[in-house]
Amino acid sequence: MDRVYLIGNGYVCNFITAKFSSEYDFVGICRSKKDNCAHNYSVDVSNDNGILKEIIEKDGYVVYLAPPQNNGLKDQILVKFLKSIYKKKIVKIIYISTSGVYGDRKDALVNENEKIMPRTERAQRRADAEYQIKNSGIKYTILRVPGIYGKGRLPLKRVNDRLPLIKKEICKHTNLINAKDLSNIIIQTLTNNNTANIIMNVSDGTPIKTTEYYLHIYDQLNMKYPEFIDYAQANKTYDSKRKSFINESMILDVSLMNEIFPDIIEYKDIKEGIKDSLG
């Protein structure tokens, strides 16, 4: 049974281990105490304390989901991680990046060959992490992932707080992926030879206006819609993180994903994905 080290054993990893624990020997590494893996370690990977060399003692795959620190332009946590392991023991590393590295493309179709133009410091740290992975000497796959939703990961607080939504006719597009679909893609990527040393966009393949996404949630909950506002009002109302999302838009081209993994997406219909997430 192949060993898989889950670095940043958080939300998405719960779906990975729930479905694939009979197929892989999972080692979970994160700050909190968890029991979803065969081997679980409560370790802060941002500390270069030598313990990672003891934990990653057997050849295996790495799925790296640990976020960068909250400031600066370089992912210092990844720097420490790569220095703290025996690279020869890593068969392949799957790095979970973000579609935010593309910046604002004003609803244009974006494939993996496009030049990245990260606008926020958060996205610049992710771009730096991609560079580190590509130059690590380890076989890799970089997945550029958009908004992740799923059970326990719907914006229900914003819905219950009735946060105003941007008018549908002017709202820009967003890209989403269900956590179950993402976990499946991650695992299939581990051993697929066509994914060696590539960058791949992943999403459900059905771009949607952000407001429509929220309205589908309101519909599923049988709730009355909130107030609709324009972008000028939104930039006065929303917090800084929310504003960075609404002011960037693109349509992810997932042709490569569909070529390598045809029919891998179960929740192409966002309404079905929301229904499952609320179940």
Enumerate the language-model features and the residues they cover.
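NAD(P)-cofactor binding segment of oxidoreductase domains
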Residues: 57-95, 128
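Mid/C-terminal beta-alpha module of Rossmann-like enzyme folds, strongest
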Residues: 192-241
